[in-house]
């Protein structure tokens, strides 16, 4: 799957939520996420623009690989994710294989949805508030159309496309 994603920093969560609802987004759920990232054995993922993580989402665990970003505008990239039963054993496996653990990213995420576009408001420990718009696609040829839709949503929220952040939360933390 390819995840088309854009992220912007926000100041007023309530204002953004109100605007999202006016655009037809519906609240889905609120959850806590802790992401434990690992750096590569044979390459530095910061240099190759890849990511490998274990996510704890309210007690549900996932391993995710993210490939390099595929454009200069967004955070669009290949994403492969699998649910796992035991995050600690997976963590041990990665360490035994030589992967280096990076300090975790913790956030409270509120998810809103309109059709197949998800809007997440993240309150990230040590970084503040962000809005992420994302949609999973299987055909790369859909990417530009999806990005156009997302740009229209930003415009309706009075957020300039110049405010788009391509850096991950790890990069924003300087890790």
Swiss-Prot record:
Annotated ranges, domain CYTH: 1-175
Main location: cytoplasm
Example GO biological process: cAMP biosynthetic process
Keywords: ATP-binding, cAMP biosynthesis, Cytoplasm, Lyase, Nucleotide-binding
Residues forming the catalytic site: 37 (proton acceptor)
EC number: 4.6.1.1
Cellular component annotations (GO), alphabetically ordered: cytoplasm
Gene3D superfamilies assigned: Hypothetical Protein Pfu-838710-001
Matching InterPro entries: Adenylyl_cyclase_CyaB, CYTH-like_dom_sf, CYTH_domain
Localisation per UniProt entry: Cytoplasm
GO molecular function: adenylate cyclase activity; ATP binding
Top-level taxon of origin: Archaea
SMART domains from the UniProt entry: CYTH (SM01118)
Catalytic activity: ATP = 3',5'-cyclic AMP + diphosphate
Similarity remark: Belongs to the adenylyl cyclase CyaB family.
Function, as annotated: Could catalyze the biosynthesis of cyclic AMP (cAMP) from ATP.
The protein's name: Putative adenylate cyclase MJ0240
Annotated source species: Methanocaldococcus jannaschii (strain ATCC 43067 / DSM 2661 / JAL-1 / JCM 10045 / NBRC 100440) (Methanococcus jannaschii)
Lineage: Archaea, Methanobacteriati, Methanobacteriota, Methanomada group, Methanococci
